[in-house]
Swiss-Prot record:
Record gene name: ALB
Subunit structure: Interacts with FCGRT; this interaction regulates ALB homeostasis. Interacts with TASOR. In plasma, occurs in a covalently-linked complex with chromophore-bound alpha-1-microglobulin; this interaction does not prevent fatty acid binding to ALB.
Name of the protein in question: Albumin
Disulphide bridges: 77-86, 99-115, 114-125, 148-193, 192-201, 224-270, 269-277, 289-303, 302-313, 340-385, 384-393, 416-462, 461-472, 485-501, 500-511, 538-583, 582-591
Residues annotated as binding Cu cation: 27
All copies of domain Albumin, residue ranges: 19-211, 212-403, 404-601
Binding sites annotated in the UniProt record for Ca(2+) 1: 30, 268, 273, 276
InterPro entries recorded: ALB/AFP/VDB, Serum_albumin-like, Serum_albumin/AFP/Afamin, Serum_albumin_CS, Serum_albumin_N
Keyword Cell division: no
UniProt similarity note: Belongs to the ALB/AFP/VDB family.
Annotated CDD domains: ALBUMIN (cd00015)
Length: 608
């Protein structure tokens, strides 16, 4: 590749922020501009999400009042952009609304201290008070008849409650995507409420929607964590790798533009700038659909859809076909005599080009693996370009990638084989033992949640064709481990977890995989009450029964971290038989009272 091309790409990279999407300086009133672009329905939905994500304890009715006030003000500004306060930034307008709430300090304590700050510090302060694990009651879905009655009486209020409940429990949920899920939810209700058996129609559809929405939430949280901890450069590298895999026929200039725009709008949503984010996401979708010829042959079906469905479809579009006869990577990145000169003159562009070329050739790799390879290449050039004979030093760099590639491949193979042998529930239990031994100080509910989510990787990824397994497994696990890290950062208890969570995001999964049993942990004292159960467990749904048993398994491992597999299987087998027997007994509680102490005694003996 000639160096003039690099200079062109450098120009493209530096100028991308000023192209296309980002033209907000031209508008006298930002809020009027966003209202006109988004339309009233989406505007109100986004404002509701924003307030729900910042003020997670407030009831729905209070948020609706704020939303209506902001919407009325926006309409005033649409009518006259020079009206009072219409020229204020959205941060200022939203921050002033939050700070005007009379009960702010009573309800949110230290959050009220943010109001003494000026923008942008005030908004940053609000962001720091978002709670990833708010103290809210579990959301219980009403029965189908009650839901249909509420939906048919007032669909707008019904869907408003949905946005509010999801947003306050997931304060980093990707706002325009949440609007998409609300649309899907509404369509399910419209379809199913006309059916004779409403529950049979609603339950499986909403369960599937919930699963997808939760996956979307953890993926977005990983993106926000990456931006918060490592900044735009790290996220843009992720975006370049992913876009290059999806759109291998697009040139580097096009990929750079898409990655830059995606980085900007993702940062907006992560910073709570939801109106800008949603508007810019729609603009990016428009740009992609207007430039399909230079991006991908797979976009047309998405581009025929309305805005929310279009953006969602584009984010999940299948990878385009690889270009024919791609040249060897070695020519530009190993054999070229000016590798060190090209690297020194524009490091980020040179590395970005390497990442682009490698990623477009490897849709079968995870983004995290591609970034580890780019990091290895960068470290090799840093070392070798300072030596007397650089080319002799970096000549084998592509061969040195092999161990980095083999490690996740072996992980996927071993875990998918284990999943196929044990099934999802058994695989989750194996992960519970593994992760409790690595981090026994972590709370039992967090370990159960993490292991159950990690265990879903089997049914999600191991069923895919071989070429799709690695990216599915590692990128999914990265998102789940980020959830563990976010919760652990709030209340750190394990030095091993802290070590993995504070390092590089792309090294996090290998770090967790390599963690040994924590030898510093002092085993928990055995308490009979931890393993005492009553007849009420028999009436629980199967999922909740599983979680009770898995919590007991965590506690067993915390009591005996070095328990062997056969020991744990013996105890779990006895426990399952005990539950089966007592739940079938005529006098269930008497059975639990009589056989429970025997189970506790035999468990202690088995683990002795």
């Amino acid at each position: 590749m000639k160096w003039v091309t690099f200079l062109l790409l450098l120009f493209v990279s530096d100028s991308a922020f000023s192209r296309g999407l980002f033209r907000r300086d031209a508008h006298k009133s930002e809020i009027a501009h966003r209202f006109k672009d988004l339309g009233e329905q989406h505007f109100k939905g986004l404002v509701l999400i924003a307030f729900s994500q910042f003020l997670q304890k407030c009831p729905y009715e209070e948020h609706v009042k704020l939303v209506n006030e902001v919407t009325d003000f926006a309409k005033t500004c649409v009518a006259d952009e020079s009206a009072e306060n219409c020229d204020k930034s959205l941060h200022t307008l939203f921050g002033d609304k939050l700070c005007a709430i009379p009960t702010l300090r009573d309800s949110y304590g230290e959050l009220a201290d943010c109001c003494a700050k000026k923008e942008p510090e005030r908004n940053e302060c609000f962001l720091k008070h978002k709670d990833d694990h708010p103290n809210l009651p579990p959301f219980v879905r009403p029965d189908a008849e009650a839901m249909c009655t509420s939906f048919q009486e007032n669909a707008v209020t019904f869907m408003g409650h949905y946005l509010h409940e999801v947003a306050r429990r997931h304060p980093y949920f990707y706002a325009p995507e949440l609007l998409y899920y609300a649309e899907k939810y509404s369509a399910i209700m419209t379809e199913c409420c006309g059916e004779a058996d409403k529950a049979a129609c609603i339950t499986p559809k909403l369960d599937a929607l919930k699963e997808k929405a939760l996956a979307s939430s953890v993926n977005q949280r990983l993106k926000c964590s990456s931006l918060q901890r490592f900044g735009q450069r790290a996220f843009k590298a992720w975006a370049v790798a992913r876009m290059s895999q999806k759109f291998p026929k697009a040139d580097f200039a096009e990929i750079t533009k898409l990655a830059t725009d995606l980085t900007k709008l993702t940062e907006e949503c992560c910073h709570g700038d939801l109106l800008e984010c949603a508007d810019d996401r729609a603009e990016l979708a428009k740009y992609m659909c207007e430039n399909q010829a230079s991006i991908s042959s797979k976009l047309q079906a998405c581009c025929d859809k309305p805005v929310l469905k279009k953006s969602h479809c584009l984010s999940e579009v299948e990878n385009d076909d690889l270009p024919a006869d791609l040249p060897s990577l070695a020519a530009d990145f190993v054999e070229d005599k000016e590798v060190c000169k090209n690297y020194a003159e524009a490091k980020d562009v040179f590395l970005g080009t390497f990442l682009y070329e490698y990623a477009r050739r490897h849709p079968d790799y995870s983004v995290a693996l591609l970034l580890r390879l780019a990091k290895k290449y960068e470290a090799t050039l840093e070392k070798c370009c300072a030596e007397a004979d650089p080319s002799a030093c970096y000549g084998k760099v592509l061969d040195e990638f092999q161990p980095l590639v083999e490690e996740p491949k072996n992980l996927v193979k071993a875990n998918c084989e284990l999943f196929e042998k044990l099934g999802e529930y058994g695989f989750q239990n194996a992960l519970i033992v593994r992760y409790t031994q690595k981090a026994p100080q972590v709370s039992t509910p967090t370990l159960v949640e993490a292991a159950r989510n990690l265990g879903k990787v089997g049914s999600k990824c191991c069923v895919l064709p071989e070429a799709q397994r690695l990216p599915c497994v590692e990128d999914y696990i990265s998102a789940i481990l980020n959830r563990v890290c976010v919760l652990h950062e709030k209340t750190p208890v394990s030095e091993q977890v802290t070590k993995c969570c504070t390092g590089s995001v792309v090294e996090r999964r290998p770090c967790f995989s390599a963690l040994p049993v924590d030898e510093t942990y002092v085993p928990k004292e055995f308490k009979a009450e931890t393993f005492t159960f009553h007849a009420d467990i028999c009436s629980l749904p199967e999922k909740e029964k599983q979680m009770k048993k898995q919590a007991a398994l965590v506690e067993l491992v915390k009591h005996k971290p070095k328990a062997t597999g056969p020991q744990l299987r013996t105890v779990l087998g006895e426990f399952t038989a005990f539950l089966d027997k007592c739940c079938k007994a005529e006098d269930k509680e008497a059975c639990f009272s009589e056989d429970g102490p025997k189970l506790v005694a035999s468990s202690q003996a088995a683990l002795a």
